[in-house]
Amino acid sequence: MFDTMTVTKAAGALIGSLLFLLLMSWAASGIFHVGTSGHGAEGEEHAQAYTYPVESAGGAEGEAVDEGPDFATVLASADPAAGEKVFGKCKACHKLDGNDGVGPHLNGVVGRTVAGVDGFNYSDPMKAHGGDWTPEALQEFLTNPKAVVKGTKMAFAGLPKIEDRANLIAYLEGQQ
């Protein structure tokens, strides 16, 4: 099956490939100066030369940190049309037609009791959360669902931008 010539060709290809990699490594280290930089003490990591301390945004302890505009102000100027675009992220699991998907339907969610859709199988932590889905409660939940309701089945990571949350809530308010 294998004759001497086939084995010789395979060995030559392997050795040639290794030689090529060795030469390319040697050429690259010559061009890009890979290795010690000659700066600092023996064994010092090069990356340490670029580290610097970062002070907290609040300055001294006890100072209030400006977190931007409050939610009520942003909600007052929210754009439901922009919220409809943000709702595209929700469509994979939620519907607005009154039928449940992977998640409960969101038709009439603003003002509804938390875990209040009859017949939907909510997680125990969501059932225990209680309260109503006010715009403020939705805003907090949509920031980071897993932090607000630990153990929720909702896999969504959250909406980091306050404007996106306000626009989405304004859109959902119109879907009553």
Swiss-Prot record:
It comes from the Bacteria. The keyword Ion transport does not apply. It is found in: Cell membrane. Coiled coil: none annotated. GO terms for molecular function: electron transfer activity; heme binding; metal ion binding. Heme c binds at residues 90, 93-94, 126, 154. Mediates the electron transport between the cytochrome bc1 complex and cytochrome-c oxidase. This is Cytochrome c-552. It comes from Paracoccus denitrificans. The gene is cycM.
